[in-house]
Amino acid sequence: LTLGEFGTLYDCACTNVKVYVSRIMKLPTNLDSDGMNTQFFIFTLKDLRNAIAHNNVIFDTRFKTGKTDQRLVTLLEREVGISNIDFKYMDAYIIMITYFLRKMGETKNACKQFISSYQQQTEFLRNDLPISIYNQILGTQHKSNMLALQNFISKS
C-alpha cells in the first residue's frame, strides 16, 4: 500500500472515522471539525516522500504536485505560532512533519534532533551560496521559523 493509496483509502472513510482519527491525534476541533486535516497532511507528505524515494536529495519544493489546502496551513500557523507558512519552502514541510510527530507522541528530544539536523544542513547551504540564492531556496523567514518551531516543541 503506497502513501498515495493510503491517502485515497483515508479519503473514502466516512466523516465519523476522520473525526475519530483527529480526536486520537488531539487535533483542535475548531480547526478540524470534519477530520480533513489528517487527509491533507497525508497528501502533502506523499509528494515529499515520493521525491525522496525517487530522487534521494531534496533541494527545493519542485516535487509538489498540488496546492496545499489552506485549512492545513491555518492549523499549522495557529498551533505552532508561525505566520505565513508557505509550502514553496522546505521549512513548511519541516514544520508540518514536526507538528504531526508531536501529535503522534514523538518525544520532544527526537523532534529537537530532527530540527537540529535540518538546521545544520541549511547552515551548510548558507555557507556555500550567496545569500540572495539561499533566500530564494529557503525564504527570508527561515531563522524565525525554526526558532518558533523550537519554542512550539518546548511548550508542547
Regions found by a protein language model. Name each.
Residues 1-155:
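Long, contiguous internal "core" modules enriched in hydrophobic/ aromatic residues
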